[in-house]
Amino acid sequence: MYRNGWGSKPGQECVLAIHLRQQAFEDYLRQAVYSSYHEGLGIERAEWQAQVKQSEVRLQWDPDHDPYGEKLPRRAIQLGLRGSVIKRFAEEDIVLIEEISAYVHEQAEHVHKQQLQHLVLPQESPLHIEDAALRTYLQLDT
């Protein structure tokens, strides 16, 4: 909710919860190219630039945030989809779409009143990825 200001940023007042098939999400991760170059990728910058141009999935790790917007030690993944992948996302990979704007605005009130004990948030758990090469590429064990 940090990124859309609890549904209060202009143009981001409508909040959707999109449920995907887990296999689809993992497929996106396998196709992803980091949005920024760093030496830990193990390839030259020119090769990375070529991959970025061809890729239909961009990957970026950002700090995760607590309800007040303070950074947490864990990271949150952002994926950007385009081309045939976005078509597949829309037509095949979505299991459920929920319009949750009212719920998000209610939860924001608890945050603004500093009443976090009243927050009702989804229970999160880390996604376990068994593919060792993918885990390494995503730097999940660092």
Residue ranges and their predicted role:
Residues 1-9:
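Long, hydrophobic N-terminal alpha-helical segment
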Residues 9-16, 22-142:
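Conserved NAD+-utilizing ADP-ribose enzyme module
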